[in-house]
Amino acid sequence: MEIFPAIDLKEGRCVRLYQGEFSKETVMNEDPVAQAIIFEKFGAKTLHIVDLDGAIAGESLNLPIIEKICKAVRIPVQVGGGIRSLVAVEKLFSVGVDKVILGTAALYDKTFLEETVRLYKEKIIVGIDAKNGFVATRGWLDVSEISYIDLAKQMEKIGVQTIVFTDISKDGTLAGPNVEQLELLQKNVATRLIASGGVASIQDVKKLNDMNIYGVIIGKALYEKTIDLEEVLEVTKLC
């Protein structure tokens, strides 16, 4: 199982939100580059970065910081948030990003998604964020009438190989992942799944590993030290 430490960028800082609410933010580190270096030092193999400002604005607003992170670490970096054009995708790759995560565009611009997947194949990940089972977009501010299962099936047909699934109600809560929704997703698609939201303990990670989930994104639990990064990397290596 892959472990992805999370760095969420807002106004140039590393923050965590509670249940996706932008008004409920906690600054975890004023220097996201330093945080990336810390994660790498403790053994992270890949970093997961979300441009929260970009998710709302519809364009990357933290590109200079993302570029600095890519230059500061030797491990791959995957980035999501506000990426809604081929130019934006190409910019991220040009500054050293390894994989790009598309969210809102996956729901509203299938032509762009199909073209991007055709060009970059496994380098394109789709992020599906759900609220009560329905897909949320534009920085989680809008909730659609499309179920997360239906969107995942559409993504699989297009050729998307990896999906990041986030249950917004769990994000930043340390309440444990939404195992039921993940199990239902597994039954409906064969894509690789990365779980995000609510992971609070080594036991949560072991449960996801037992389900054969491809990867897990861990944010608040690392910052609040309910999960030790070195320990969880060792545990998943042995599983």
Curated annotation (Swiss-Prot):
GO terms for molecular function: 1-(5-phosphoribosyl)-5-[(5-phosphoribosylamino)methylideneamino]imidazole-4-carboxamide isomerase activity. It catalyses: 1-(5-phospho-beta-D-ribosyl)-5-[(5-phospho-beta-D-ribosylamino)methylideneamino]imidazole-4-carboxamide = 5-[(5-phospho-1-deoxy-D-ribulos-1-ylimino)methylamino]-1-(5-phospho-beta-D-ribosyl)imidazole-4-carboxamide. It is an enzyme of class 5 (isomerase). GO terms for biological process: L-histidine biosynthetic process; L-tryptophan biosynthetic process. GO terms for cellular component: cytoplasm. The keyword Cytoplasm applies. InterPro entries: Aldolase_TIM, His_biosynth, HisA_bact_arch, Isoase_HisA-like, Isoase_HisA-like_bact, RibuloseP-bd_barrel. Pathway: Amino-acid biosynthesis; L-histidine biosynthesis; L-histidine from 5-phospho-alpha-D-ribose 1-diphosphate: step 4/9. Keywords: Amino-acid biosynthesis, Cytoplasm, Histidine biosynthesis, Isomerase. Its EC number is 5.3.1.16. Pfam families: His_biosynth. The active site is at residues 8, 129. Belongs to the HisA/HisF family. This is 1-(5-phosphoribosyl)-5-[(5-phosphoribosylamino)methylideneamino] imidazole-4-carboxamide isomerase. It comes from Bacillus cereus (strain ZK / E33L). The gene is hisA.
